[in-house]
Amino acid sequence: MTQQSILFIDRDGTLIDEPKTDFQIDSLEKLKFEPNVIPALLKLKNKYRFVMVSNQDGLGTSSFPQADFDKPHNAMMALFNSQGIEFDDVLICPHKPEDGCDCRKPQTKLLQKYIERELFDPATSFVIGDRATDVQLAENLGIRAIQYHPEKMNWDLIAEKLLGESVTNNGDRTPRYAEVARKTKETDIKVQVWLDETGVNDIKTGVGFFDHMLDQIATHGGFRMNVSCKGDLWIDEHHTVEDTALALGTALKQAIGDKRGIARFGFVLPMDECKAECTMDLSGRPFIKFKADFKRDKVGDFSTELTEHFFQSIAFTMLATLHLAVEGDNEHHKIESLFKVFGRTLRQCIRIEGNELPSSKGVL
């Protein structure tokens, strides 16, 4: 049987809203669809098969009677079907965490048929869900995850990533693409950058938090990239982070090309619980001013001191003038906001606005 591209999709908190009071959808009044989930699935259905995978704690017990579950669930399925959205399977684990079953996500027993018969293509199948257990399920299946978030990764963005839609009005220009391979005694790196399309980024450096940060650059930069790095992580992550930045900066510089028609300048000032600022000029003159105070040495498997070093390396290989600053209390969020704001600013700089070189000197 031919392997298929399958989306294994969580239900509560992903397809429909999950009540924060009791985390149960046990009445029609609680049934609320996530924004734009139906238009997104309609776009995706010609490319992917859908399988619903859900944990429903205590389903069929006095704490969550089957009849209370069935009414809103059947209404949800009927609405999906009426709009032309069909799920090949609806797989539900009724157990609680303390039951110790092997079918509760992130365990894979619910998907045993798909694993044993090799029904899904690992290269083109994904788990979509809002929880860390969904991400872990994807890892256990050997596929990639997209973690749903109503703002940061909503259904519009998910459809955009999975369909790889063109995001730049590039006219008759050749699509801006670059590929860089960099091999040293410490690292073996390959970077591919597509500046004029979005899609799922395939990023594997061996440093989980760093992978997540690189994905933020591409996602908020409005482009697609693949990054593969095999580094000397048995020593530490320094060479991996530094050399990846050098390779990525080189790839971005090559993909941008002669800079004719680009906006060149960018400025972003987002305000969350962290205040992150970024200004950028693709000037051809490398410079960085970085202001951040980290109170922890590590976030996950990533050394916080490498944050500045990453941006310094990428600025100098891109030949960009870069100013970055962040304030806040949560170290994870501070670093993440820097990568996001860098991506957002880069998005402005590489935007095509015409055909002129944005410099009075006639050269950049």
From Swiss-Prot:
EC number of the protein: 3.1.3.15, 4.2.1.19
Annotated stretches, region: Histidinol-phosphatase: 1-175
Family membership: In the N-terminal section; belongs to the histidinol-phosphatase family.
Binding residue positions for Mg(2+): D10, D12, D130
UniProt keyword annotations, A-Z: Amino-acid biosynthesis, Cytoplasm, Histidine biosynthesis, Hydrolase, Lyase, Magnesium, Metal-binding, Multifunctional enzyme, Zinc
Keyword Lyase assigned: yes
Reaction equations catalysed: D-erythro-1-(imidazol-4-yl)glycerol 3-phosphate = 3-(imidazol-4-yl)-2-oxopropyl phosphate + H2O; L-histidinol phosphate + H2O = L-histidinol + phosphate
Domain of life: Bacteria
InterPro entries: HAD-like_sf (IPR036412), HAD-SF_hydro_IIIA (IPR006549), HAD_sf (IPR023214), His_synth_bifunc_HisB (IPR020566), HisB_N (IPR005954), Histidinol-phos (IPR006543), IGPD_sf (IPR038494), ImidazoleglycerolP_deHydtase (IPR000807)
Cofactors required: Mg(2+); Zn(2+)
Source taxonomy: Bacteria, Pseudomonadati, Pseudomonadota, Gammaproteobacteria, Pasteurellales
Positions annotated as active site in the UniProt record: D10 (nucleophile), D12 (proton donor)
GO cellular component assignments: cytoplasm
Compartmental location: Cytoplasm
Binding-site residues, Zn(2+): C93, H95, C101, C103
Positions of region (Imidazoleglycerol-phosphate dehydratase): 176-364
Single Gene Ontology BP annotation: L-histidine biosynthetic process
Pfam families assigned to the protein according to its UniProt record, in alphabetical order: Hydrolase_like, IGPD
Main location: cytoplasm
Species of provenance: Actinobacillus succinogenes (strain ATCC 55618 / DSM 22257 / CCUG 43843 / 130Z)
Associated pathway: Amino-acid biosynthesis; L-histidine biosynthesis; L-histidine from 5-phospho-alpha-D-ribose 1-diphosphate: step 6/9; Amino-acid biosynthesis; L-histidine biosynthesis; L-histidine from 5-phospho-alpha-D-ribose 1-diphosphate: step 8/9
Protein name (Swiss-Prot/TrEMBL): Histidine biosynthesis bifunctional protein HisB
UniProt xrefs under HAMAP family: Bifunc_HisB, HisB
GO molecular function, one term: histidinol-phosphatase activity
